[in-house]
Regions:
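PAPS-dependent sulfotransferase catalytic core
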Residues: 210
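Acidic, low-complexity segments
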Residues: 66, 92-93
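Extended lipid/amphipathic-ligand handling interfaces
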Residues: 1, 9-19, 27-30, 37-51, ...
Length: 340
């Protein structure tokens, strides 16, 4: 029996002979402005068509968005277990290697491996996922799992773990608890994270809300002469959507320059659908530090906002307690902004 289907985003051609289904062509347009995903394979169908194929082998070819190389995927299974391997043609290590098992009640991925060599910041790790009640559809399935992320920079290796669930993903109302814990290292910077959060809303417009205790920290060297002793981003109560960041955005920076001195800066403000080129972030800032070459201390305070792509300082007051250079001393010089 020949099978053919031609739709707007799907093209299918195959042959069914007894329990054997041969797919000679399956093209699926999965991403806008991208070539279709192409799949071919052979499957053994159950005697009673009330479930998944009994066994099968399928291969697919696809393009990754924003990446030039083609990706090949291969899926094998026999009875209730199998393996999915995804390979980029320009890279020897699999992007995905997922051994899986399936029953009528549960889908399990155990000790899966993944890697992402792109964007100049290679990542890799392990993945385990459990989906209970999967046959009842996405709206009723209970999802939980663990994803580890390994990074490496000049500061050494870093490891972070994302635990998720148990919860559900829904086209209308997702409810999935998440927690990211660990560290990442790139160049001379180390980033530490403890981020409990809740994913909610529809899958087409999700909301990620950070819960009490959510904190990002970092330390290291940005440029040769400036050392970051610590920078902290408290994120409790902050929400992230497709439109941007909402909530109280804060940062506390402690740093030093070996010859010029050390300093502390604070920034605290309210964000509304904020992105670097859209939305609004209104803030105030204050800080103090030392200026060793002139035996001085300094302070700064003010207000400002980041609206769309424009940064505006509305208030600024900064000055030194003194400036000493040789036998000359200047007492309490100060700069105050008259207008934005």
């Amino acid at each position: 029996q020949q099978l053919r289907y031609q739709g707007e985003k799907v093209k299918f051609q195959g042959q069914l002979k007894g329990q054997q289904l041969t797919v000679s062509e399956l093209d699926v347009v999965a991403f806008e402005n991208q070539p279709p995903v192409k799949l071919v394979g052979e499957f053994t169908m159950p005697l009673v068509p009330d479930g998944l194929p009994v066994s099968g082998h399928a291969t697919a070819t696809l393009n990754l968005p924003q990446e030039p190389s083609l990706v090949d995927a291969e899926l094998d299974w026999q009875e209730n277990s199998g393996q999915l391997i995804v390979l980029a043609r320009d890279n020897g290590d699999p992007l995905l290697d997922l051994p899986w098992q399936i029953t009528r009640q549960q889908l399990t991925v155990s000790d899966g491996r993944w890697s992402w060599p792109y964007a100049g910041f290679p990542l890799s790790g392990r993945l385990g996922v459990k989906v209970d009640n999967w046959q009842a559809g996405l709206e009723n399935a209970l999802i939980s799992g663990r994803l580890s992320v390994l990074t490496q920079g000049q500061a050494g290796k870093g490891n972070a773990v994302l635990n998720f669930g148990p919860g559900k993903l829904s086209m209308d109302n997702s409810q999935l608890p998440l927690q990211l814990t660990g560290e990442a290292k790139q160049a001379d910077l180390i980033l530490y994270a403890r981020l409990p959060a809740q994913l909610s809303g529809s899958l087409t417009d999700p909301t990620l809300a950070f819960e009490p205790g959510a904190l990002l920290r970092s330390k290291g060297r940005v440029i040769d002469s400036l050392d970051i002793d610590e920078i902290r981003w408290p994120l409790a109560g902050v929400k992230v959507t497709q439109r941007g960041v909402d909530g109280r955005l804060q940062a506390i920076l402690q740093a030093h320059e070996n010859e010029l001195g050390d300093f502390v800066l604070h920034m605290d403000g309210l964000a509304n659908d904020f992105l670097p080129d859209a939305g609004r972030w209104q803030w105030r800032y204050w800080g103090k530090g030392s200026f060793t070459p002139m035996n001085a201390t300094w302070d700064v305070a003010g207000k400002g906002e980041w609206h769309d792509s424009t940064i505006t300082l509305t208030d600024l007051s900064t000055g030194f307690d003194q400036l000493q250079y040789g036998t000359m001393t200047v007492e309490k010089p100060r700069l105050i902004l008259d207008k934005p």
